[in-house]
A protein has these predicted regions:
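Mature secreted bioactive peptide module from preproproteins
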Residues: 68-178
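N-terminal prepro-regions of secreted/extracellular proteins
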Residues: 1-91
């Protein structure tokens, strides 16, 4: 029991210390997000950025009129019913950047592991690894920037693992054209 408490306290404490630092100006729209966040993977074709659990960035992605939201009561936007929480995917920067955000249905700290599956109309396929840690009902966000856009479809898949040993899968249907 003591080990579980110490491990939980350490993980929870580390989540509050690992908050990414952003510039003084807060972003207002998707175009402002293009150079924010920490680069976690980069090659000749794509750049993957992690925005952490900043609620401002999550709201910008969610409130974009072109966002595809997968949650139980998504309103007029496309919806998929499921108990896992909320996943939002939208394209920005003329289809060259895929923004994503997830919010599992848990109040426990969680670790999210996932992929943005890029399926180009030319037949080329590419998976970009995404993920991070979130705490106490927060959202986690990121972006995948493509150096070239030949058109296609992006799908977000993945699972959030909480400290109470529960799994929260991204609902099917969280995807968008780019």
């Amino acid at each position: 029991m003591k080990k579980l408490f110490v491990m939980s306290f350490t993980v929870l404490f580390s989540l509050f210390l690992a908050v990414p630092a952003f510039a003084g100006e807060e972003p207002q729209n998707l175009d402002d997000l293009s150079n924010l966040g920490e680069i976690i993977y980069q090659d000749d074709e794509i750049t993957v950025r992690d925005f952490g659990n900043d609620p401002v960035i999550s709201n910008i992605i969610t409130e974009d009129p072109n966002s595809v939201i997968a949650e139980e009561n998504a309103g007029i936007k496309p919806q998929v019913v499921g108990p896992g929480g909320r996943a939002v995917v939208t394209a920005g920067d003329y289809g060259r950047t895929i923004y994503w955000t997830v919010r599992p249905n848990t109040l426990w700290p969680y670790h999210f592991e996932g992929k943005v599956k890029l399926r180009y109309y030319s037949g080329f396929k590419r998976d970009a690894p995404v993920g991070g840690m979130g705490a106490l009902g927060s959202s986690l966000s990121g972006a995948v920037h493509m150096n070239k856009n030949n058109g296609g479809y992006a799908t977000l898949t993945g699972t959030a693992y909480s400290l109470d040993f529960s799994k929260y899968k991204v609902l099917p249907g969280a995807g968008t054209s780019f």
